[in-house]
Amino acid sequence: MRKYSFILILLLFSQLAVQAQDAKRIVSLVPWVTKSLYLMGEQSRLVGCTSFCPVEAADKIEVVANAMNINIEKVLLLKPDVVIASSLIKPETIDNLRKLGLKVVYQAYPKSFEEICAFFIQIGELVGQGANAKELVFQQKARLTKLKVGIPEGKNPNVFIQIGAKPLFCAVPETFMEDFIRFSGGKNIAAELKLGSVTREYVLKQDPDVIFIVTMGIVAQEEKDTWLSYQSLSASKSKKIFILDADKTCSPTPILFVDALEEMIRLMY
């Protein structure tokens, strides 16, 4: 399945290369696209972004969308060469943008570290930074290999990655979030699940050795305190319940993925 997803992402961006190889004006509706452009020093091409995109205030980039909805009128006024949208945007909204003559590239949520890398390279090629993007990916894969070599042998802790609180979601197979678990030498307690929604009772029954909470603000600490209150839980007994930076963990570039993985390995062992 991962092989087909990887092929699909390359096909999508081969179209992008033909349509927008000289893109001077980009509207990014995907936070990790915005991060990628900043990493490459190409943020000057950004004319529009979402309220969740990590931009510098001094760059005065127009906010044209929140997580779900786009202000189409604002997008049109910006006259972008290309709009990069994600699977969080309603399909009918994407269709409307295309009908209005805008070039829109649809980007599904990456399902693996490999897809994150492929996507980053294609964005680099879009803005004339293909070689630099490939070099950065090479460096991060080397970091990843080094991290994996340093993992203690014979230890394969059961891991629960909690994403959000109400409802309770977890990292499942065929997602890049599960790559965090695989690459760190852990075993995913949700390995048999296809959907990410779980109950607290399910997690308690699986009895994870390590819990990573990926959410923001006071909710994260409340969730940590809740898990710690279950004194028979292995992760609670060993105090291996940790809060991770949601921005770094949920919408990573190759660099941020490896940064997050490095932190997780340090905390696990």
Where do the model's predicted regions map?
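A short, structured surface patch at a secondary-structure boundary
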Residues: 25-89, 105, 189-192
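Sec/Tat signal peptide C-region and signal peptidase I cleavage site
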Residues: 16-20
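Short helices/loops that flank or line small-molecule/ion binding pockets
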Residues: 72-79, 99-100, 199-210
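Basic- and aromatic-lined ligand-binding clefts that recognize polyanionic substrates
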Residues: 24-37, 131-184
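Sec-dependent N-terminal signal peptides
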Residues: 4-14
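His/Asp/Glu-enriched short active-site or ligand-binding loop at hydrolase and phosphoryl-transfer sites
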Residues: 50, 174-196, 243
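Structured C-terminal subdomain patch of bacterial secreted/periplasmic proteins
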Residues: 24-25, 70, 115-128, 134, ...
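Flexible loop/hinge segments that line or gate small-molecule binding clefts
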Residues: 54, 93-122
